[in-house]
Amino acid sequence: MTPGLPAASAISLPNPTTYRGAGCGQVTQEALLTVKRWLIMSDAAVEQRRALIRRKKRERMGASPLGAKGLSEEQQTMIRELMEAQMKTFDTTFSNFKDFRLPAVCSSGREVPGAAHTPVGEEAAKWSQIREDLCSLKVCLRLRGEDGSVQNYKPQADRSGAEIFSLLPHMADMSTYMFKGVINFAKVISHFRELPIEDQISLLKGATFEVCQLRFNTVFNAETGTWECGRLSYCLEDPAGGFQQLLLEPVLKFHYRLKRLQLHKEEYVLMQAISLFSPDRPGVVQRSVVDQLQERFAVALKVYIECNRPQPAHRFLFLKIMAMLTELRSINAQHTQKLLRIQDIHPFASPLMQELFSITDG
């Protein structure tokens, strides 16, 4: 026996008589060539090749639907409950969003001066920070009337920043409306109701903004860069640097990237659940329980993708979704700081917003 080669007894040589019949010559030759390649390979190389074969087999199995190994009955029940909660609490046409405040508008679409004055004196430094935060991103709002008329609000051309104050009451109304929907969404979920009230409050304080952004993404039109909320539509006006500069804005960049994934409704609601059941939110007591719940929703999302998405085209979709949720956590923290700075100089938050963002009077 040649040193370094596997023992002959360890290899089952093909018997040429086994391959009698049509095409037997070609099959026998291929089989013998395969054995010859194995004979000249070291033990380590043979094992490496076997591992490669096993890996390719697993990949082929992953490329097909899981069938019987798909979503468990428990996972299907979880997803059904989330879908029902979403349907009951998310007004996708915004038909129930009424009696909201609007900034000064005009039907001609001309620019309308902001209604508030820029703070001066000792508040100048604070206002400078607010202007740096927000003035490069000017929100445009359009309202379609039932009679077909259109009212436009466009920010001023100058950079005084006063137009931000003009829009704040409306944004507070929209945010409060969306926040109520998220709270009701959580209350429908049985696992959420089973948690202590203190943990429910802590989870909602941490996740409400994030869940709102996930819901807003479902009405985001990536072709026009517009959030289409029934009769209302919102967009960000191009800054001096143009559209490319606009894409550097974290929230807008997030919405474009998430929309590009073309998620199913089930994937959106599972993302909402994963965000809601985050065990590391401040004030959460039963962290291990919440952590286990989050893991169950994450596993359900992973299995759902494997069952309903063609592989390997979407083999990394689950990882991309989890990365988007991490990015959303960062945006949430930045948004909270900006909101607190504006609230400090120009109080506008509704009582519910004050509760969720722990804003105290004075």
Segments predicted by a language model, with ranges:
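Intrinsically disordered, low-complexity regulatory regions enriched in Ser/Pro/Thr/Gln
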Residues: 1-362
